[in-house]
Amino acid sequence: MFIDRAKIYVKAGDGGNGCIAFRREKFVPKGGPAGGDGGKGGDVIIEADENLDTLLDFHYKRHYYAERGEHGKGKNQKGKDGKDLVIKVPVGTLIFDVETGELLADLVSHGQRVVVAKGGKGGRGNAHFATSTRQTPYFAEKGEKGEERWLYLELKLLADVGLLGLPNAGKSTLLSRISNATPEIAPYPFTTKTPNLGVVEREDITFTVADIPGLIEGAHENKGMGDEFLRHIERTSVLVFVLDAADMVNPPQRAYEILKKELYLYSPKLLEKPRIIAINKIDLPEAQERIPEIEEWLKNEGVPYVFISAKEGINIDKLLELMEKYVKEKKESIPVVEIEKEIEELKQENKKQEIPEIIKEGDLWILKDKKTESLANKLDLYNPQAFSYFLNYAKRRGIIKLINRAKIKDDEEIKIGNYVFKYNSKNNSLELIE
């Protein structure tokens, strides 16, 4: 079964908690804190695999979880990191965030990977919080939660050439003639119910050809499942319109207009792609009678054309030469991606420091600062030592000054991470609300 759309849930592993421990050894009378850090949670990674050709597996399993990090241990032992979860999808899969609609990745090559959910960092053990004035810290950080999200997967076949035509135009026969594909072929319409891919090997180039199931009028509205298939030609370099010269109901002239209309109504950009017209079944007597009339029409269209018989192999090499020409032109025009430059730009972007801000939503003030929010969520702020550590951090980070500038009153509440505080102007500090 060919399935090209799926919705899945992914959850990265939570980070392990930091450990609260102290050295208790026979010859170490004043053993200090020795709590190890928690391990990092595993990431969820999606990887393109050329051996897959459908998203069918995701209709049976929709929820995916990476391994959580182990908790830290005594003697400064770090917890083991959680294993990454690698989910394999066909080459040509697009990944969208369901909530935002954002395109996260377009996996167009074998082995290409993207992290779709990052594992949480492990919490620091109490050994990190020892100072000259706090020699026995009885607190540690909790591990961060791993990211979670719903994803929408959409497979768009990666083909250089797309074969288009009305039902029974002979596309499957043509594909089997020019490539290694073995599609189902029968003398009745709608034999092809899913897209078929074939590989064409020429002397100095190899390219892929997709046989798109027969389109009918209204395909852009998903009549005859047309909308399901039209999107598979969006990546192609050239479109080949396979028209049946022997069709009396939809002769080539009418069939061509139907196909163009459906492409335009689905996406006008599709008509900007190079086109080739292949007039098929010229081996039939009724088709041969119409060749002069069809050729006169083709000359006025100004589109490269070939009269062929996919069944008998007539003029197939001429058609392949045209396909090859457009595929080569497309591949030569693809710009070279400056990967190193992109990586450097990404590094510079990551260096930008987030500026804390505080906003009011209804009666509640909310601090927007990932670092401070993250620290609050990692600590048990009902632990006096942990709360004192957090307050000192908030002062160093400039959060208290920010609250002063916002002119927040003593009775107003401030949300930082998962905790709610009240500002004490007398002490210029924060008080945790129980």
Swiss-Prot record:
Mg(2+) binds at S172, T192. GTP binds at residues 165-172, 190-194, 211-214, 280-283, 309-311. Its cofactor is Mg(2+). Residues 1-158 form the Obg domain. Keywords: Cytoplasm, GTP-binding, Hydrolase, Magnesium, Metal-binding, Nucleotide-binding. InterPro entries: G_OBG (IPR031167), GTP-bd (IPR006073), GTP-bd_Obg/CgtA (IPR014100), GTP-bd_prot_GTP1/OBG_C_sf (IPR036346), GTP1_OBG_dom (IPR006169), GTP1_OBG_dom_sf (IPR036726), OBG_GTPase (IPR045086), OCT_dom (IPR015349). PROSITE patterns: G_OBG (PS51710), OBG (PS51883), OCT (PS51881). It is found in: Cytoplasm. It comes from the Bacteria. Pfam families: DUF1967, GTP1_OBG, MMR_HSR1. GO terms for cellular component: cytoplasm. GO terms for molecular function: GTP binding; GTPase activity; magnesium ion binding. GO terms for biological process: ribosome biogenesis. This is GTPase Obg.
